[in-house]
């Protein structure tokens, strides 16, 4: 019996109910002028995280991928029931695929999801080839594509549904000396300010892979304050 035959989607539905409740509570507390963005991992990324990038048989990959896609589709459905403005699919590990694999394992899934939920789905990846980028540009119902790399992105911003994600190092975010941390943010923002506001349209300020447990909370507040005051 293969893995898929033993899989019960209802068990996942029950497990993820906490997220459904959480989103309802958040949406109810947010004012109408505040956006709520949901997120999930992409199938390839979830597979790599589950296997810790260990080389595993192609048979297991082929059995697992349809299940992951089913789980993600269900999760997206649940999140979009709660009036979120956009759902982002984070798929950093897709850069490990060659162009043929990207066409086979990523593009069909994105087409299906974006067609089911037109202009409600965004996609994030990084360090991909120009060929993969061109494929993403052709997905008409995909609301947003975010690339965590340059890839000539400054020339592409004015003419596509594309955003540039600039990651602020989470190593710097853990600095305990307030002045050193503040100086690091200022240098980061100074580089951004070298471009006109019109050129910065679509830019996203990101904390790389997020806030670590060792990150001082004051640093997170300072980062948000400086980004909002200096780049608004």
What are these regions (language model features)?
Residues 1-3:
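Short, small-residue-biased leader/transition segments that mark boundaries at the very start
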Residues 9-27, 61-74, 176-186:
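Glycine-rich anion/phosphate-binding loops
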Residues 13-51, 150-152:
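Glycine-rich, aromatic-flanked loop segments that form ligand/cofactor-binding clefts
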Residues 20-22, 97-110, 131, 150-162:
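Active-site-adjacent beta->alpha loops and helix N-cap segments on the catalytic face
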Residues 34-63, 93, 160-172:
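N-terminal small/glycine-rich loop or linker at the start of catalytic domains
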Residues 36-39, 80-91, 120-126, 202-206:
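Short beta-strand segments at enzyme active-site cores
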Residues 54-87, 99, 107, 111-119, ...:
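Alpha/beta enzyme core
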Residues 114-232:
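Catalytic-face loop-and-helix region of soluble metabolic enzyme cores
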């Amino acid at each position: 019996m293969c893995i898929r035959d033993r899989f019960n989607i209802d068990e996942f539905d029950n497990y993820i109910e906490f997220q459904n409740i959480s989103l309802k509570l958040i949406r109810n507390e947010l004012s109408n002028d505040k956006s709520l963005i949901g997120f999930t991992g992409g199938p390839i990324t979830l597979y790599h995280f589950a296997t810790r990038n260990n080389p595993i048989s192609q048979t297991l990959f082929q059995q697992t991928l349809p299940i992951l896609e089913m789980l993600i589709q269900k999760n997206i459905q649940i999140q979009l029931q709660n009036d979120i403005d956009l759902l982002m699919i984070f798929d950093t590990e897709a850069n490990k695929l060659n162009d043929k694999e990207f066409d086979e394992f990523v593009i069909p899934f994105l087409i299906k999801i974006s067609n089911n939920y037109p202009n409600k789905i965004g996609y994030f990846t990084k360090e991909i080839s120009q060929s993969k980028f061109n494929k993403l540009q052709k997905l008409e119902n995909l609301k947003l594509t975010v690339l965590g790399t340059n890839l000539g992105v400054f020339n592409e911003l004015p003419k596509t549904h594309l955003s540039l994600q600039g990651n602020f190092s989470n190593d710097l975010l853990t600095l305990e000396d307030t002045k050193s941390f503040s100086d690091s943010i200022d240098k980061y923002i100074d580089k951004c300010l070298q471009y006109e506001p019109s050129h910065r349209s679509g830019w996203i300020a990101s904390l790389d892979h997020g806030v670590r447990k060792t990150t001082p909370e004051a640093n997170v507040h300072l980062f948000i304050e400086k980004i909002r005051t200096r780049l608004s």
